[in-house]
C-alpha cells in the first residue's frame, strides 16, 4: 500500500483501454481491397451461410469483414469501405463493409432501413 506522499509523487497508472477495431487505426472507416469473398457458418445455435470478405486495408491490416444485406456484387479486387462493428455469431469478424460506397452497390428493392444498406429512395 503506497503512502500519500508516494501517490502525490507518482500517481496511479491508468489501465489502457483495448481498441475493439485496431485495424481502423483511429479512423471511422478505412478503404480496402477484397482479397477473398466467401461464406462462413455461424456459431452454435444459429445456422446460415453468412457472406464475408477478407479485406486488405490501407492501414496495412488484413481483416475479415461482414457483407450486410441480401445479395452483393463483391468479388476479388473490389474496392470497399470498411467500418467497425462485430458480428456476434461469427468469431473473428469485427468489421462491416459499408454498402452503397465505392464498389459495393446498395441492396436492391430495399424499402425500409435503407440508409444502412445504401439503397436509394424508391420513386
Swiss-Prot record:
Residues modified as 3-methylthioaspartic acid: 89
Keyword Cytoplasm set for record: no
GO terms for MF: rRNA binding; structural constituent of ribosome; tRNA binding
Cellular component GO terms, alphabetical: small ribosomal subunit
GO BP annotations listed: translation
Cross-referenced Gene3D superfamilies: Nucleic acid-binding proteins
Matching NCBIfam families: rpsL_bact
Function according to Swiss-Prot or TrEMBL: With S4 and S5 plays an important role in translational accuracy. Interacts with and stabilizes bases of the 16S rRNA that are involved in tRNA selection in the A site and with the mRNA backbone. Located at the interface of the 30S and 50S subunits, it traverses the body of the 30S subunit contacting proteins on the other side and probably holding the rRNA structure together. The combined cluster of proteins S8, S12 and S17 appears to hold together the shoulder and platform of the 30S subunit.
Family per record: Belongs to the universal ribosomal protein uS12 family.
Subunit structure: Part of the 30S ribosomal subunit. Contacts proteins S8 and S17. May interact with IF1 in the 30S initiation complex.
Name of the protein in its database record: Small ribosomal subunit protein uS12
Organism: Syntrophus aciditrophicus (strain SB)
Gene: rpsL
Amino acid at each position: 500500500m503506497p503512502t500519500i506522499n508516494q501517490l502525490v509523487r507518482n500517481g496511479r497508472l491508468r489501465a489502457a483501454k483495448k481498441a475493439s477495431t485496431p485495424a481502423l487505426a483511429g479512423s471511422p472507416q478505412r478503404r480496402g481491397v477484397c482479397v477473398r469473398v466467401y461464406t462462413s457458418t455461424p456459431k452454435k445455435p444459429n445456422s446460415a451461410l453468412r457472406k464475408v470478405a477478407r479485406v486488405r486495408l490501407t492501414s496495412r491490416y488484413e481483416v475479415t469483414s461482414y457483407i450486410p444485406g441480401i445479395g452483393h456484387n463483391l468479388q476479388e479486387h473490389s474496392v470497399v469501405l470498411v467500418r467497425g462493428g462485430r458480428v456476434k455469431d461469427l468469431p473473428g469478424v469485427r468489421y462491416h463493409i459499408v454498402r452503397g460506397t465505392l464498389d459495393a452497390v446498395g441492396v436492391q428493392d430495399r424499402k425500409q432501413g435503407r440508409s444502412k444498406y445504401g439503397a436509394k429512395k424508391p420513386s
